[in-house]
Amino acid sequence: MAASFGEKLLLEVHEEGLDELLHDLRATCKEKLPISRAHFGIAPVDELLQLFMPPQAGHYQPPIEQEHVSGQGNPTSPTAGHGPPHPVPPPSISRLYPVLEISSTSSAAGKSQIVYHLAALAILPSEFNGIPLGGFGSAVVFVDTDGRFDAERLRTVAREIIQSTLQTRGASSSLSHSIEATLLNSLQHVHVFRPQSSLALIATLQSLDTYLLDISRHVSANRPVHAIVIDSATAFFWQDKLQDEIARTEDIGRPAADIERERLKKESFYLADVYADLVAELKRLQHMFDCSVIYTTTSFNGRAIEKQPDFYGSYNILDTAFPNMPSFRSPLPPPWGLFPTLRLVVQREAVRPFSPSATVSEVQREAPMRQEIVMRAEFVGSVNGWGRENWPRKLLEELKRRDEGVFGFRVGRNGITFN
């Protein structure tokens, strides 16, 4: 009898580590704060993100209801017949943090410029000299797989955010020394990594928590991690694809059992496994640091926004509600297609080509106007509509009311302006 009673008591014991306890405590405190709709600080992106974000997770049933569900009314459940059940500790609270994909069908489409703007907002303080900046006062992990990270450009973008805010508020512009001090302090919280392959990228992500939790290696110990940025996630795709094809060629004629054993032990290269491991590591870090993930991709078989899909492309032709919406599958293997919360497509605003019948004088007359349009550096962003035939009707209606999810932005020498 005593042994049976002790066994029942043990079933009610919930064991967890200190890290899980602190994680749940922080998440619980955050849930009591007013809900902010500014995940990234860019109004059109945040508005679109709200449409695609699933309901907030982390709520759990009261102990009695939970016991009823878990026991399914079974009288043989551990606490049946022993009075009110003891409170069952809630499961680990899981808050939802967005994953943003920014893709294009060509280079120089504005992807990295948006990333710089997002990173600048993440590291800047929430206010400057008492004036709200819209910054998050956090740290950013920037994984530069393309080898093109430009710290000076990031500094310029961050400076423009401060100066444009001061100008809008009518504040004094003679604060250059304070602005530079703020920029210097903020840029210390951008942690740049430059892996040279997908396997190196996985290793970087696997050791990232060790680095971030070692307060002797950086000055961001008192700041939360706002986002992990990968620019770009497709940087190593073609070399990975070649390596995968070589590995599959070497497997010809070998016993299937040996091939599978090596795959399970990760002794051989598999493209699908590598990219699945990348997503798994990013999700692990998201759960650990409660941060967003932002990554860029370049689609290898997409089309420009203004062009219509054909029957032989990678476009979804089943839905005609948004005929001008760009729509192409993820260029990366599964599960990357389902990983992002919001998929954006960006491109430079196209300039209408000359008419085939235009004369030389007409071309010369229009040339200055066309050059002026090019110099404006105007870009357009939109929701990637791949799979929209499965989207809820309410979501489609909301997108229709929001110009089909299209927004404009201008990239200038000093920064980015969103329409």
Where are the regions a protein language model picked out?
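N-terminal regions of ATP-driven nucleic-acid and macromolecular assemblies
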Residues: 1-419
